[in-house]
């Protein structure tokens, strides 16, 4: 249900010309379904749409902190995203490691703008690296919800848009009571 709230805020905050060429990106296999929901929300014939996804190539010979490290993000989709606004959608940002790799890969493919759509922005490693990437022009914004705690100081960042889901949650509670 956060999809509609995030989309509404996104559309209301962007100039119409930024919505003409959209590339919907899944940062991994688990996010393909979510990517497709966003892709199908823009069914207008006046919008040029692309879809892409990344596959995480892991080093299965080394276990680091209980995980097999990602050694490369392999991209499947249009290799030239010149002029496209890329929308990367996932359930959450935990540390942000994969998102940083995805941003770099999309910039190599000439994405004009990059926005991240996530239901939960946990920022487990803080936001310093997000500040750094924003200052370097690696992404243009993160759209997330208020369904997880986001410190007030983080909410003041120009790149962070916190979408209010309280009405939707209240409706769900009301309709199931």
Question: For each predicted feature, which ranges?
Answer:
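PRPP-associated nucleotide enzymes
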Residues: 1-177
């Amino acid at each position: 249900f956060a999809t509609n709230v995030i989309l509404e805020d996104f559309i209301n905050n962007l100039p119409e010309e930024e919505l003409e060429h959209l590339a919907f990106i899944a940062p991994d296999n688990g996010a393909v379904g979510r990517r497709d929901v966003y892709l199908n929300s823009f069914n207008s014939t006046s919008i040029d749409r692309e879809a892409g996804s990344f596959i995480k190539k892991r080093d299965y010979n080394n276990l680091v902190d209980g995980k097999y490290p990602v050694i490369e993000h392999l991209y499947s989709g249009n290799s030239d995203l010149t002029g496209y606004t890329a929308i990367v959608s996932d359930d959450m940002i935990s540390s942000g490691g994969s998102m940083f790799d995805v941003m770099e890969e999309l910039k190599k493919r000439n994405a004009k703008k990059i926005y991240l759509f996530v239901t939960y922005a946990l920022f487990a490693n803080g936001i310093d690296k997000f500040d750094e990437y924003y200052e370097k022009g690696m992404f243009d914004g993160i759209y997330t919800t208020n369904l997880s705690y986001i410190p007030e100081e983080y909410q003041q960042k120009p790149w962070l848009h916190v979408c209010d889901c309280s009405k939707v949650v209240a409706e769900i509670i009301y309709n199931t009571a």
